[in-house]
A protein has these predicted regions:
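Structured alpha-helical
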Residues: 1-120
Length: 120
């Protein structure tokens, strides 16, 4: 079975900022860029990958192209499922995170846009 056949949700090829850190870590967030995102997880590249099995906190702003609404912030908790080696020497490592939990919150600007359109 192909990996794409096992996926539970549509993946969007989006290069958006992700703010990540190990669950309950006092360390500051690390900013990385997504390669793709779905409602079930995210894939990103980094030069300092977490270990497989690490629980992560991830924060991102999901764009209108995905949600159909003004930008909303997602706060996610997930588990690192896979760390892939760099494709070429000197490039970044790939990290796959499965979301176990997420909250979606609208920003004040997005709430105003929804209210002015009569959608809330």
């Amino acid at each position: 079975m192909k990996l794409s056949d096992r996926r539970l949700a549509q993946r969007f090829s989006l290069a958006i900022p992700l703010y990540i850190r190990a669950w309950k870590s006092p360390a500051p967030e690390q900013k990385v860029e997504s390669v793709n995102v779905s409602e079930c997880g995210a894939y990103f590249e980094t030069d300092t990958p977490p270990s497989e099995g690490t629980m992560m906190q991830i924060r991102l702003d999901m764009p209108r192209e995905v949600t159909g609404d003004p930008t909303v912030e997602w706060r996610c908790t997930g588990k690192v499922m896979r760390v892939q080696p760099a494709r070429f020497p000197g490039t970044l490592l790939g990290v796959s995170v499965r979301f176990d939990y997420y909250e979606v919150s609208r920003t004040a600007d997005s709430l105003l846009a929804l209210a002015s359109s009569g959608r809330i």
